[in-house]
Amino acid sequence: MVDIAATLIHWYAENKRELPWRETTDPYRIWISEIILQQTRVVQGLEYFNRFMLRFPDVRALAEAPGDEVMKYWQGLGYYSRARNLHAAAKEIVEKFGGEFPRNYSDVLTLKGIGEYTAAAICSFAWKLPYAVVDGNVYRVLARIFGIDTRSEEHTSELQSRLHL
């Protein structure tokens, strides 16, 4: 039988792109990258990420910035509710968590604009907590590996239970 994990790890080692959010365990930088990359190609997102980090290097800088300035730095990315949610969540982090990004999944999930995927990404990549970061592409690959038809809710639930999600 083919060792799928070893095959994927080898492929990644040969083909990975060097991206700043892969070289950090800073939950703020991971969060910003995850939100920017929603509905955005990596090439375009990288430019916005770098510019955003220069202006808003940490959660306090983002929380304290005027809303119109946050929107200015987001201009051109579209889906402007993402920027409004980032700004609101940054304020929540400062007010409710003393400016420290929450370290547990359920607290991360309470932040405005953060769903299960983004919460899992932050907790997994920043703190190595055991949360599966599963998007549509991962579902498709795993469904093929397990021979599961994901067109129905029942089969999608089967895949989720195999992944312990």
Across the structure, where does each feature detected by a protein language model lie?
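Catalytic cores of DNA base-excision repair glycosylases
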Residues: 2, 6-153, 157
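Short "domain-exit" segments at the C-terminal end of structured domains
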Residues: 158-165
